[in-house]
Each structure stands twice: as C-alpha cells, then as structure tokens.
Design a protein with these regions (language model features):
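Cleavable N-terminal export/targeting peptides
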Residues: 1-30, 244
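Short glycine/proline- and aromatic-enriched beta-strand/turn motifs that initiate or cap beta-hairpins
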Residues: 23-85, 240-244
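Extracellular/periplasm-exposed beta-strand and loop segments of Gram-negative cell-envelope proteins
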Residues: 43-70, 94-134, 159-189, 217-234
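Short cationic/low-complexity microdomains
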Residues: 202-218
C-alpha cells in the first residue's frame, strides 16, 4: 500500500471520528409517544394433558394433545421520557389468540368385565387459546438519521392466559362412544420481553414504525404434563404519535 493511499485512509478515518462521536451523543428531543401495532406472533407450543376419573368402580384415564399455534397480535401502548433525553418508561397491552384441534385418547373400563379396559379415541376442533399481556419497558431512544429513530427496550411482562383443555369424559354405552367437553382454564403468570422499535417520522408528530420483540412466560395449566410456554417472537408495524 502506497504512502499516499495510507494518508487518504487515515484522513477519511479522522473525518469519520467526529461524526461517530456525534451519533453516540445524539439527543432524543420528544417527550414521549403513543403507539399502535398489528403483527404476527411466531411459534407454536405443545400442550399435553392427562386426567383420571372413576367409572364402573374402576379408574378411567383420558389424555389429550394439542398444538398451541401462533396468531395475529394487536398492541396499544405508550412511553414517556423519565431520565435525561433518551431513557423512557413504557407500557403496552397486547392480545393474541388462536384455535387448535385436540386429539383425545382414553382407557375406559368395561361395564361387565372387571380389569378389561377399552381404548377409545376422538378428535375435537375449536380449542381456543388467548393471551392478554401487559409489557412494562425501559426504552432507550436514539436518533440514527434524519427523521429515523430506534428504540431498544426490555422489561417484565404479565400474561393473562385462557386455554381450552380436556378435563373430563362422558361415556355412552354400548360402544363405547365418548364425548370430551372443552373446559376453559384461566392463568396469570409473569415473564419478560425485549425488543427493537424503529420509527420514521412522516410528519412532525406522526411516525410509522416496525417492531421486533421476543416475549416469554410459562403457565401451569390444570392437568398439563408440563408448563405451557406463552409469548413468542413478535413482528409487526404501526403508527406512533409523538408528544413534543
């Protein structure tokens, strides 16, 4: 590499230093914002349950398996500057829901012969799963270009979960034929969230934005073999209204 080429590279590097330093100290000048997003929550989780009940003076067993699927989410929220120019405190509410099919297998005692169980299977549709979540965030807002800001956030999440499961079985003889009604279970659990929000100003007080966020929690569902994972990776877009 020639001396002239090295000098050019060094000069370019020295010119870039002040610009980089300036970018590191750029101040976010607004007071806060209100946000609305629509997007998709990606990922699915298995839910397996087992339960027993008394029938013909013996014990019957019923097991179910279903896949809690991903779905569309909506979000309302906001944030307000709490320290310096760049740190905001935020809160948002998200809702997502989905339906699933449930595969049911049961071991049903014989009404006449003792200790001669019969295997029965069935399939149900329309098992509902929904998650309402409140996300509390510390957000670091940083202007990165003209009209373009990036917010990095993290904090705890409170999940309010509703889940349809199989908890009982109705047996009709002869056959047997079975009916497995769905029962709604409600649980509240705590998890966390972390994400990035990109905002581009189209007006002085209005921005369009995109969000990528990971949320996680786990809930104890009655009869479930393991805790059910809630949340997932969320990606969406929406609008922001800025407070000056």
């Amino acid at each position: 590499m020639s001396l002239k080429t090295r000098a050019i590279i060094l000069a370019a590097g020295l010119c870039a230093v002040p610009q980089f330093a300036s970018a590191q100290t750029m101040q976010w000048t607004d007071k806060g914002f209100v946000t609305f997003n629509v997007g998709a929550q990606v990922g699915s989780h298995d839910l397996d349950t087992n339960s027993t009940f008394s029938l013909y003076e013996e014990t019957a067993t019923v097991a179910s398996t279903q896949q809690v699927k991903s779905g569309t989410f909506i979000e309302f929220g906001g944030a307000y500057r709490v320290w310096g120019n760049n740190l905001l405190g935020g809160v948002s509410f998200t809702h997502t829901s989905s339906d699933a099919n449930v595969a049911v297998t049961a071991s049903v005692p014989d009404p006449v012969f003792f200790d001669r169980p019969r295997a029965v299977s069935a399939s149900l549709s329309g098992a509902k799963h929904s998650e309402n979540a409140i996300h509390l965030n510390a957000i670091w807002m940083l202007p990165v270009a003209n009209k373009l800001d990036v917010g990095v956030s993290a904090g705890p999440s409170i999940f309010m979960v509703k889940q349809d499961t199989i908890t009982s079985l109705t047996v009709t003889e002869p056959g047997p034929s079975v009916n497995a009604p769905l029962s709604e279970v409600k649980k509240t659990t705590v998890g966390f969230n972390a994400g990035v929000d990109v905002q581009y100003l189209i007006r002085k007080d209005i921005a369009v934005g995109g969000i990528a966020r990971y949320t996680w929690g786990s809930a104890d569902i009655d009869g479930a073999n393991d805790k059910v994972t809630v949340g997932g990776f969320q990606i969406g877009a929406g609008v922001r209204y800025r407070f000056k």
